[in-house]
């Protein structure tokens, strides 16, 4: 007699495909304090409930990374444990205040505060160690600066959970970002892409995943940082690994502008631009995207969208592989400040040859 197959009720319910798989990065302005984190959490809840699979990359709270680096340098030069204690109080007050403003659920808030206190204690010990050693290595700088994101991620994840959405927080290393040991400017190893997919891919359907931007770890498990625009780079790495539909970089501007709106108020948003054009603008002074940021996205042909956290309905700028034909001849104008252009015109009179070589040799020794 043939045995009947057991069928679960859940198997009979048609599964809805996610609308999109999106990696969203929120910068320091977007998560600057608890009220802004609450706003971010509400955005994430909305996109998640629409059926999207969401991975969040968070930067540190506003100004925290600079203060971490400043106090690390003070610890190495002044060696005063009292200054470390003062900084610990400052950091605790800032992040506890953010929890109060971002998280309503008292049980979630309690859990997050416990995580923060443990991490701040770890940081304090590291800074006191630097006081006694009187030196600050590149490895130590990476370790200290990583705490900005490592303190922000639990608050962002907690704010999402406080709104009734399941969320898990990861450090970059826990998410699978394995890098070279070039402290301060590490690069992801090829194994990163497989590890990220293995560790995060299975949880995308049911959770909003929050990952620290800017940091990874080397093959020995030591914390590394990804350098300038590291959180954008983290988002691009995760997006490439997870084969995301889009990578969204949430900033305080309405996308990539035709020029700097602080200089030209009439500047407009560029609706679409190619990877190559975006990289060229970055090289020539536009600060919205760092060229290295979009390398992993380019590898998988994943569109990168630049959006405004505080105007979320605005579509922003979409950065894609193909060049978008625009009716305007010039798409954008960028500016590099404090650059001098020297023109040498050498008249080859007798005894005057080599003038420009001598001039350049002289300039080489100047600041």
What are these regions (language model features)?
Residues 251, 306-308, 345-348:
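Active-site proximal loops enriched in glycine and acidic residues that flank catalytic Cys/His/Asp
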Residues 3-294:
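Nucleotide/pyrophosphate-binding catalytic subdomain
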Residues 289, 300, 312-317:
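Surface-exposed amphipathic alpha-helical tracts and adjacent flexible/coil segments at the periphery
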Residues 246-248, 303-306, 311:
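Internal nucleotide-binding/catalytic subdomain
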Residues 297:
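Acidic-aromatic/histidine active-site loop/patch
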């Amino acid at each position: 007699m043939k045995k009947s197959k057991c069928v679960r009720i859940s198997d009979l319910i048609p599964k809805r495909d996610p609308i999109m798989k999106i990696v969203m990065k929120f910068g320091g302005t977007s998560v600057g304090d608890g009220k802004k984190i609450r706003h971010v959490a509400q955005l994430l809840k909305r996109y998640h409930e629409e059926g999207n699979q969401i991975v969040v990359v968070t930067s540190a709270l506003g100004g925290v990374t600079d203060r971490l680096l400043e106090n690390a340098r003070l610890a190495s030069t002044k060696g005063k444990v009292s200054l470390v204690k003062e900084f610990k109080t400052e950091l605790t007050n800032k992040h506890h205040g953010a929890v109060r403003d971002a998280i309503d659920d008292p049980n979630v808030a309690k859990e997050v505060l416990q995580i923060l206190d443990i991490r701040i204690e770890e940081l304090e010990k590291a800074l006191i160690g630097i006081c006694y050693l009187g030196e600050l290595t590149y490895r130590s700088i990476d370790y200290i600066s990583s705490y900005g994101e490592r303190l922000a991620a639990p608050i962002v994840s907690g704010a999402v959970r406080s709104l009734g959405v399941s969320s898990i927080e990861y450090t970059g290393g826990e998410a699978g970002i394995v890098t070279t040991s070039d402290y301060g400017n590490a690069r992801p190893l090829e194994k990163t892409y497989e590890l990220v997919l293995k560790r995060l891919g299975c949880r995308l359907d049911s959770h909003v995943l929050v990952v620290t931007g800017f940091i990874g770890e080397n093959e020995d498990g030591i914390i590394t940082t990804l350098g300038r625009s590291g959180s954008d780079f983290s988002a691009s790495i995760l997006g490439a690994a997870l084969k995301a539909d889009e990578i969204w970089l949430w900033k305080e501007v309405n996308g990539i502008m035709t020029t700097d709106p602080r200089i030209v108020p009439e500047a407009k948003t560029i609706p679409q631009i190619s990877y190559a054009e975006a990289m060229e603008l970055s090289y020539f002074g536009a600060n919205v995207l760092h060229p290295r940021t979009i390398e992993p996205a380019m590898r998988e042909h994943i569109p990168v969208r630049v959006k405004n956290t505080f105007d979320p309905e605005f579509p922003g700028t979409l950065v894609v592989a193909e060049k978008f034909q625009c009716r305007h001849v010039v798409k954008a104008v960028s500016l590099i400040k404090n650059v001098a252009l020297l023109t040498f015109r050498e008249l080859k009179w007798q005894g005057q040859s080599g003038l420009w070589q001598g001039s350049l040799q002289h300039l080489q020794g100047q600041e």
